A protein has these predicted regions:
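Hydrophobic packing residues within well-ordered alpha-helices of enzyme cores
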Residues: 126, 198-201, 229, 250
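Periplasmic-binding protein-like
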Residues: 177, 236-241
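A structured beta-alpha segment of the ubiquitous adenosine-cofactor-binding alpha/beta core
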Residues: 148-149, 216-236
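Residue-level signal for inorganic ion chemistry
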Residues: 24, 43, 81, 103, ...
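ALDH superfamily catalytic-core signature
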Residues: 237, 245-292
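Conserved small-residue-rich beta-alpha loop and adjacent elements
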Residues: 138-212
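Terminal low-complexity tails and localization/encapsulation signals of metabolic enzymes
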Residues: 1-49, 83, 87, 138-162, ...
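Glycine-rich loop-to-alpha-helix module at the N-terminal edge of alpha/beta enzyme cores
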Residues: 46-136
Length: 292
């Protein structure tokens, strides 16, 4: 349970300047000025965020590729990958209050929804894909006598992921869970207005035992970081949740670069709008945060 005392103890914590997470190390370098993180709750400056560029993306992708090729994760025994992902889910659950409150301060999600739909859902997703690790089977194809045809499933390589601002932990886990369970390395870009909780969740992955370089976070703007990722010649798959126009851009860049595979979830907004003349404001608030 998330009680008011816990919320109050976390909501005023200072937030250190946030940077990329590359090769297991935080890095606040960027293209120039840092992005100011403004809390939507009261408009105050919360912290700063590293503004990545093409060079930062190239470094993160190179680190991810090297980690994939060295095999510490991609060739790890499936049962061992499973154990790491379960430990990660445990840490997400254990730090749920911190993650939820950090997310609220960063992107303004209502606290009840943030607690249920963010760390809770993310941990459940990671547990689901942890169980997938040792349950991926190949096939024996039907062939004529004297011929043996086998289908062997292997990780694809480096996965690039771009997620939006609204549910960074939940949507982040949707991207990270399957990619990591199958042995891939990942470079992920969170929304520049909602990066803090995702960064913290990825730090917890390293605490759980994920080898350095397997999971890398590059913060910054879509027009620079996202563009560089979708044009990278060394990212094998791009996954994206966001707008239709940006999805089209990613597909175009994928075709113009290395014909990388793309998996897109496009469009959709579900805002809660309460008008000034609402007859029962308290009921509207209770409905918005799931209490009725």
């Amino acid at each position: 349970m998330l009680d008011q005392a816990t919320i109050d103890s976390l909501r005023h914590n200072n937030v250190a300047p946030a940077g990329h997470l590359i090769d297991g190390v935080s890095d606040t370098s960027g293209a120039g000025e840092q992005i100011e993180v403004i809390s939507p709750i009261d408009g105050t400056r919360l912290t700063t965020l590293a503004d990545g560029d093409e060079a930062i993306v190239a470094r993160a992708v190179a680190v991810a590729r090297a980690a994939f090729e060295d095999g510490h994760w991609s060739k790890m025994a499936p049962a061992a990958r499973k154990a790491v992902m379960h430990r990660w889910a445990d840490l997400v659950q254990a730090n749920a209050a911190e993650l939820a409150v950090l997310g609220v301060r960063d992107n303004g999600t209502e606290i009840g929804m943030a607690f249920r739909a963010e760390p809770g859902s993310a941990a459940a997703t990671l547990r689901y894909y942890a169980e997938v690790c040792d349950k991926i089977y190949g096939e024996v194809a039907p062939t004529p006598d004297g011929i043996l045809g086998m289908i062997h499933k292997e990780p694809v390589g480096v996965v690039g992921a771009i997620i939006p601002w609204n549910f960074p932990l939940m949507i982040g886990a949707w991207k990270l869970g399957p990619a990591l369970a199958c042995g891939n390395s990942v470079v992920i870009k969170p929304g520049e207005s909602a990066s803090l909780s995702l960064l913290r969740m990825c730090e917890l992955a390293h605490e759980a035992g994920l080898p350095p370089g397997v999971l890398n976070v590059v913060t910054g703007r879509g027009e620079t970081v996202g563009e560089a990722m979708s044009l990278s010649m060394d990212i094998d798959v791009m996954v994206f949740t966001g707008s239709g126009p940006v999805g089209r851009r990613i597909m175009s860049n994928a075709a113009a670069s290395n014909l990388k595979r793309t998996y897109l979830e496009l469009g959709g907004k579900s805002a809660n709008i309460v008008f000034a003349d609402t007859p029962d404001f308290d009921a509207a608030v209770a409905g918005a945060d799931g209490r009725q």
